[in-house]
Amino acid sequence: MLRYSVIFLIIAIIAAVFGFGGIAAGAAEIAKILFYLFLVIFLVSLVLGMIRR
C-alpha cells in the first residue's frame, strides 16, 4: 500500500511540473494529434474486421 502511495506521489509531482511549467500546451497539442490518429486507426481496423467476417 505504501508503495502505491509513493508511485502516485511521483506521478502527481511529474504532472505538476508539466502543468505549471508551460509544457502542457505543447503536450496537449501532441495528445490531440495522437487521439485523432489512433481514432482513425481504430475505425479502419473495425471496418476491416467487419469485412473479413
Swiss-Prot record:
Primary site of residence: membrane
Transmembrane feature ranges: 6-26, 30-50
Pfam families associated with the record: DUF1328
Keywords recorded for this protein, A-Z: Cell membrane, Membrane, Transmembrane, Transmembrane helix
Compartments (UniProt record): Cell membrane
Superkingdom field: Bacteria
Membrane-topology descriptor: Multi-pass membrane protein
GO cellular component: plasma membrane
Record-linked NCBIfam families: PRK13682.1-1, PRK13682.1-3, PRK13682.1-4
The family this protein is said to belong to: Belongs to the UPF0391 family.
UniProt protein name: UPF0391 membrane protein azo1750
Organism: Azoarcus sp. (strain BH72)
